[in-house]
């Protein structure tokens, strides 16, 4: 696919890139190859093929959450770098 200098200028402006002349030539070639590949993909017959969000079949492998009503405040506070009056102390984040 043929890419013009104006197209490269437009795309580089959108991407906030400042390209040198040799970089523009390489970008023209690369963008042309990418668009050519996309055109080739458009020729594929995808009838009956179910869309997918991942290349590999994915499933959630995490454990189920289990709600418990435990009172282990002291045990939890052992993990706190700082504590005061039974509460976690954290650095101030807002002035």
From Swiss-Prot:
GO biological process: glutaminyl-tRNAGln biosynthesis via transamidation; regulation of translational fidelity; translation
EC top class, as a word: ligase
Highest taxon of source: Bacteria
Subunit structure: Heterotrimer of A, B and C subunits.
Entry's family note: Belongs to the GatC family.
EC number, as in UniProt: 6.3.5.-
HAMAP family on file: GatC (MF_00122)
InterPro entries referenced in this protein's UniProt entry, alphabetically: Asp/Glu-ADT_sf_sub_c (IPR036113), GatC (IPR003837)
Pfam families xref list: GatC
SUPFAM superfamilies listed in its UniProt record: Glu-tRNAGln amidotransferase C subunit
Organism placement in taxonomy: Bacteria, Bacillati, Bacillota, Clostridia, Lachnospirales
Chain's role: Allows the formation of correctly charged Asn-tRNA(Asn) or Gln-tRNA(Gln) through the transamidation of misacylated Asp-tRNA(Asn) or Glu-tRNA(Gln) in organisms which lack either or both of asparaginyl-tRNA or glutaminyl-tRNA synthetases. The reaction takes place in the presence of glutamine and ATP through an activated phospho-Asp-tRNA(Asn) or phospho-Glu-tRNA(Gln).
Keyword Transferase: no
Catalytic activity reported: L-glutamyl-tRNA(Gln) + L-glutamine + ATP + H2O = L-glutaminyl-tRNA(Gln) + L-glutamate + ADP + phosphate + H(+); L-aspartyl-tRNA(Asn) + L-glutamine + ATP + H2O = L-asparaginyl-tRNA(Asn) + L-glutamate + ADP + phosphate + 2 H(+)
The entry's keywords: ATP-binding, Ligase, Nucleotide-binding, Protein biosynthesis
Organism: Lachnoclostridium phytofermentans (strain ATCC 700394 / DSM 18823 / ISDg)
Gene3D superfamilies xrefs: Glu-tRNAGln amidotransferase C subunit, N-terminal domain
Protein name listed in UniProt: Aspartyl/glutamyl-tRNA(Asn/Gln) amidotransferase subunit C
A single GO molecular function term of this UniProt record: glutaminyl-tRNA synthase (glutamine-hydrolyzing) activity
